[in-house]
């Protein structure tokens, strides 16, 4: 489990803390919104395209696809462990 978290989050190491946390928050809100771009955008007070762009950046930094359930599950685990331990 620790290895999965480390590998999933490794790609964010070069980002400033504020930017990294913004991406993590976007993912969390998107998940809490049942993967609805529109609902996540309302919570985040931004345009749905902004949510899409941020999620694509998460895919780029992690090498995971948010259209693959296994990848989404790994990212959920990684972000939750990060939130609780960091």
Regions found by a protein language model. Name each.
Residues 1-86:
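Cytosolic nucleotide-utilizing catalytic cores of signal-transduction proteins
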